[in-house]
Amino acid sequence: MLFIFAGMLSLSLVLFGLTPKIIMQRSWKLAFPDSSSTIPVADTTAKPKTQKQVDKELNTAYIFDHVIEEMIKREYHTLPIGECMGKIGSMFIGTRYVGGTLELQPERCVIDLNGLDCVTFFENTLNIARTAKIKEHELASNQNAMTFRDVLDQLEYTRYRDGNMDGYTSRLHYTSEWILDNVKKGVVKDLTKELGGKPFPVKVGFMSTNPQYYPQLVAEPTLTRKIQGIEEHINAQKHWYIPNAQVKDIESKLQTGDIIAIATNKAGLDYSHTGMIIKNAKGMALFLHASSGKKRVYLDKLISSYLA
């Protein structure tokens, strides 16, 4: 499920999961003032891969193989998807925080496990778990049944509009559209409204009004108009959030693997942070996220305390 809270995390209460109902995953949305900085402009000229890039790809493959090996060894893939996400996400604790890993020219779907930001952390965790559940029966007899390509395919399905990568503007840049699109695809279910959520007046427009901060828009100015049209569509939809004052009241309903999004009041943006819930042995809903402040993937305090 995915849930939206106001005043802190920029996600709303919504269920994330696979189309098969038995594999559905949950997540929450929260809202709070944004303090993040913008993406610096960089040279987007296409270049051959450097040795550093090759090394990063090889290291990502090594990390991926280790995660899958541990998952199969401990049979995490047999758990409900939320619990599976919790186990997989916890394996990334300590991974350094690195932003901007998706900003490639030309656009391509990429997995980089050398460093994670708040979005790529939950994206990778979700899609490794989704793939594991899809491949669960095959993995029982063949430990090599789940490949890097399988996860990349699932990631493309959730990261891009209608599940198809077709250039920079097909990526779901705004979390609010990610939610809408993945609800439509049956990947997640938004529970924000039924859990007491309030209308959230999303008015995105930051990308089209600040193209200088996005290397791809600098390189291809004609894409800005497409982005503006996407923003107008997002703004015309209905969105919901859970006010901070109500978070503690619903905290007991959170489960391990629930994805959290934190809304922002920064002009032109919708959400500023994402993460997921880990329910500990005492039943406390802790916030697991890639923290820019801690500079790593970190298991934080109670979600209500985090938002306080």
Predicted regions and their residues:
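Acidic/His-rich structured neighborhood in mature extracellular/periplasmic domains
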Residues: 92-235, 279, 283, 289-292
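Mixed-charge, Lys/Arg-rich low-complexity intrinsically disordered regions
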Residues: 223-253
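N-terminal Sec-pathway targeting helices
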Residues: 1-7
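C-terminal soluble interaction/assembly domains
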Residues: 257-308
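Solvent-exposed, acidic/flexible segments
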Residues: 57, 61, 78-86, 108-119, ...
